[in-house]
Regions:
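Active-site-proximal loop/turn and secondary-structure-junction residues that shape catalytic pockets
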Residues: 10-12, 43-45, 71-74, 108-112, ...
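Loop/helix-junction capping segments adjacent to catalytic residues or to phosphate/diphosphate-binding pockets
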Residues: 48, 77, 165-166, 194-197, ...
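Short amphipathic alpha-helical interaction segments
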Residues: 244-252
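Acidic/histidine-rich catalytic cores of soluble enzymes
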Residues: 6, 38-39, 138-244
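Short glycine/serine/threonine-enriched helix-capping/active-site loop
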Residues: 68, 106-107, 214
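N-terminal pre-domain/capping segments
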Residues: 1-100, 134-136, 142-143, 150, ...
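Active-site acidic/histidine proton-transfer and metal-coordination neighborhood
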Residues: 64, 79-186
């Protein structure tokens, strides 16, 4: 039987996004009421950071913990030690509360580069990284994933994402080709892959052996077309609904 989980970001609990946040208890209650099997951790500090307290909250709702996004800055080697500490903090929480099948989701800090934020959904080849930048990003990802595996036994996945340096199908494929398949897989996001110029079904087939985690997200082609026509940036595209409710877009689930 296929089981589906959710994440606090569906309730607006996510970095870079302003607005009212409900408490974690409400989020977990509504996940349980909707019939989800589990949850991602969400931003550090949103849910209890004490493992025993978090375990109690999940168990009384019969929810499983399965993964957590951690924002990293792979393009900036000076920030790698701090990123490593953040990743390990989250990985230890996941391992203790969720168990050995949990996954750390690396997300390269979205919407921080002006060009990549502005050109989301219409990335051109000359918008990409240099050879040296590619090595910096992939070496950093490998280092973090190996540290997580060594210290906690957990595996790590990387989330391709609009408004970052790894958005398009070609960039996603190159990232995977330059990283260690023993410790680092892909968090495949159907909506981001589609808005980034790809066909999600083809993406799943192409990267099946590296996809260890999936984010189901739909994509509204009409909003995407307006974004490209009017030059919206990534944040405005999201605000205007480029990632629509499941079933209302063009992703063939």
């Amino acid at each position: 039987m296929i089981q589906v989980a959710n994440a606090p970001c569906s309730w607006g609990v996510i970095e870079n996004v302003e607005g009212e946040r409900g408490g974690y208890a409400r989020v977990l209650d509504e996940m349980q009421e909707a019939g989800y099997a589990g949850t991602e951790l969400g931003d550090w500090g949103f849910m209890p950071t004490d493992p025993r307290a978090l375990r109690r909250e999940l168990e009384r709702r019969k929810l499983k913990l399965l993964a957590s996004w951690v924002t990293v800055h792979l393009h900036d080697p000076a920030r790698l030690p701090a990123n490593e500490a953040d990743v390990l903090r989250t990985a230890r929480q996941l391992a203790e509360v969720g168990g050995p099948d949990n996954l750390v989701v690396l997300g390269n800090d979205p919407y921080t580069d002006p060009l990549r934020t502005l050109a989301a959904g219409r990335i051109l080849p000359d918008h990409g990284m240099s050879e040296a930048q590619w090595r910096t990003v992939t070496d950093g990802a490998n280092r973090l994933a190996r540290t997580v595996k060594r210290e906690t036994g957990l595996r790590t996945v990387f989330h391709h994402h609009i408004g970052t340096w790894v958005e398009t199908p070609e960039e996603t494929a190159r990232f995977l080709a330059m990283t260690d398949p023993e410790v680092l897989g892909l968090c495949f996001d159907t909506g981001h892959y589609s808005f980034g110029g790809g066909n999600p079904v083809e993406g799943v087939r192409r990267h099946a052996d590296r996809i260890w985690h999936v984010h189901f997200k739909d994509h509204d082609p009409k909003v995407a077309a307006r974004s490209r026509r009017d030059g919206w940036n990534a944040v405005k595209s999201i605000e205007q609904g480029v990632f629509c409710e499941l079933g209302n877009g063009d992703v063939d689930f």
